[in-house]
A protein has these predicted regions:
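A short glycine-rich, Lys/Arg-flanked "PGG" loop and its adjoining helix->strand segment in the class I
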Residues: 204-219
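Conserved class I S-adenosyl-L-methionine
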Residues: 118-128
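Substrate-binding/catalytic lobe of Class I Rossmann-like enzymes that use SAM or dcSAM, i.e.
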Residues: 226-228, 232-284
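Conserved Class I S-adenosyl-L-methionine-dependent methyltransferase catalytic core
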Residues: 30-113
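Conserved small/polar residues in nucleotide/adenosyl-binding loops
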Residues: 283-291, 298
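Conserved SAM-binding loop of SAM-dependent methyltransferases across substrates and taxa
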Residues: 129-141
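A short acidic, Gly/Pro-enriched loop at the edge of an enzyme's catalytic core
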Residues: 179-191
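Conserved SAM-binding strand-loop segment of SAM-dependent methyltransferases
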Residues: 165-180
Length: 298
């Protein structure tokens, strides 16, 4: 795909149907790479990925993630997200007819699967615009929540919401790169992370730190998007790698089994899966609300 074609797409000069067609062509290229070779080749490729991951920093190019995602203003996201500003996948349950309902269903499911109870001390890693943190504070009024983000604008937005809702004594927001984040050990009943680990690289080391932060009976809840079979990095290898260059620099697509290969410090006790169509429906809903004036674009 030529730079000229991508430039026209960035300027919004193609109808949505053409943009979707282009995305499908790029996806076909990626799938062809993943499916190359026999089952042994695929297994060895995954083992190499795990080995390289375990020797990397916890996160790479964290400043790029901020530039591309997290220092974009809340005003912009207010036009393209639902009322909770949930930056991660929504859950289109049978009763969810609107994005607001699907966001709420996703937040409810997360708390249910994380086995939250009122009165717990909770740490959220990668809190985004505070959708889960504020939801937990509302539904578990006896709990204390520490929310971590690498974005100053996200912290400012969440703290404004905290003041508006009178939650100053229950929510603490920390701005820190995950490479440097540390906190007193043994204090959290629950650690939650929703769609942050795709921006991380060394999962085993971060799992080890999370284990230190948990109480002896504490649990960690991890939500990531995955490919069913293969892990891969988003690397800028040429003009067609728009996603890697402009939106997800330093990110990864984990495989469905990747976390199970990182159990030296934490053991998996339960797993759930949301079908990828929940993400597809969310993206379609965002698209329908994303035709906003250029003056609002970041």
């Amino acid at each position: 795909m030529s730079p000229f074609i991508l430039t026209l797409a960035e300027r919004g000069l193609y109808p949505d149907a053409i943009v979707r067609w282009g995305i499908r062509q790029l996806l076909k290229q990626r799938l062809a790479e993943i499916r190359s070779g026999d089952v042994e080749t695929a297994a060895q490729r995954e083992l190499r990925f795990i080995d390289e991951m375990s020797r990397a920093p916890i996160a790479v190019l964290a400043e790029k993630a901020n530039e591309q995602h997290y220092e974009v203003t809340a005003d912009f996201f207010g036009h393209v997200l639902g009322p909770h500003l949930k930056y991660s996948s929504a859950f289109w349950s049978a009763g969810a007819a609107t994005l607001a309902q699907a966001e709420a269903a996703g937040l409810h499911e997360t708390c249910l699967h994380a086995a939250l109870n009122d009165g717990q001390n909770i740490l959220e890693l990668g809190c985004g615009w505070g959708s889960l943190t504020l939801w937990m504070a509302e539904h578990y009024p006896g709990s204390r929540i520490t929310a971590v983000s690498n974005s100053h604008s996200q912290r400012a937005y969440i703290e404004a919401q905290v003041r508006e809702r009178g939650l100053e004594h229950r929510i603490r927001v920390v701005t820190c790169d995950m490479n440097r984040f540390e906190i007193d050990p043994g204090q959290f009943d629950r650690v939650l992370s929703v769609e942050m680990f795709e921006h991380m690289r060394n999962w085993p080391e971060l799992f080890a730190r999370i284990r230190r932060w948990l109480t002896p009976e504490g649990r960690f809840f991890l939500h990531v998007f995955v490919h069913r079979a293969a892990s891969y990095l988003f690397e800028d290898r040429g003009p067609a790698d728009w996603m890697s260059r402009e939106f997800f620099t330093g990110g990864m697509m984990p495989s469905d089994e990747l976390a199970l290969a990182c159990q030296d410090h934490l053991a998996c006790v339960a797993r759930w899966r949301w079908d990828g169509t929940h993400y597809e429906d969310r993206k379609s809903t965002r698209l329908n609300s994303s035709h906003i004036p250029l003056s609002r674009m970041p």
